[in-house]
Amino acid sequence: MRGYAWGAASVLLVTLAQLLMKWGMAQIPLMSFADVTLNLFMQYWLPLVVVSGGIFGYALSMLCWFFALHHLPLNRAYPLLSVSYALVYLAAVILPWFNESATLLKTLGTLFILFGVWLINSQAKVKTPQ
């Protein structure tokens, strides 16, 4: 059970990281490398901090993932990562600042992903290393 808890923490952190980076990058205009100046950092400090928080979230997620892999067989652990796709989709539809639309096709695809994860992890119990 400990492996699933670490896996869930990894999934939640990677979902948060993805949302933070999307929001932060949407606030910064597209530019070339030559446009990067100190003034740019001063003007867009908040989005840059948010993107940095997203990168830190990815690092924490990876740490949790290492612990999940320690406790779960790979064929059980790896599908858990797919849950983050569903969570990102759901959050992007619900949270107003992402302005994502829900469509039948996207929702069905997300449900298929979740069904696949459930199917793989609901099979007969196998002993997991402690």
Swiss-Prot record:
Could you tell me what this protein is called?
Answer: Probable 4-amino-4-deoxy-L-arabinose-phosphoundecaprenol flippase subunit ArnF
Q: Which organism is it from?
A: Serratia proteamaculans (strain 568)
Transmembrane domains' residue ranges = 5-25, 48-68, 78-98, 100-120
Q: How does it assemble?
A: Heterodimer of ArnE and ArnF.
Record-stated family: Belongs to the ArnF family.
Q: Which residues lie on this side of the membrane: Cytoplasmic?
A: 1-4, 69-77, 121-130
Cell compartment(s), UniProt: Cell inner membrane
A GO term, aspect molecular function = carbohydrate derivative transmembrane transporter activity
Q: Which GO terms describe its biological process?
A: lipid A biosynthetic process; lipopolysaccharide biosynthetic process
Biological role: Translocates 4-amino-4-deoxy-L-arabinose-phosphoundecaprenol (alpha-L-Ara4N-phosphoundecaprenol) from the cytoplasmic to the periplasmic side of the inner membrane.
Periplasmic face residues: 26-47, 99
Q: Which InterPro entries match?
A: Flippase_ArnF, Small_drug/metabolite_transptr
Where does the protein principally reside? membrane
Q: Which GO terms describe its cellular component?
A: plasma membrane
Cross-referenced Gene3D superfamilies:
1.10.3730.20
> Which keywords fit this entry according to its UniProt record?
Cell inner membrane, Cell membrane, Lipid A biosynthesis, Lipid biosynthesis, Lipid metabolism, Lipopolysaccharide biosynthesis, Membrane, Transmembrane, Transmembrane helix, Transport
* Pathway participation: Bacterial outer membrane biogenesis; lipopolysaccharide biosynthesis
Give the record's membrane topology: Multi-pass membrane protein
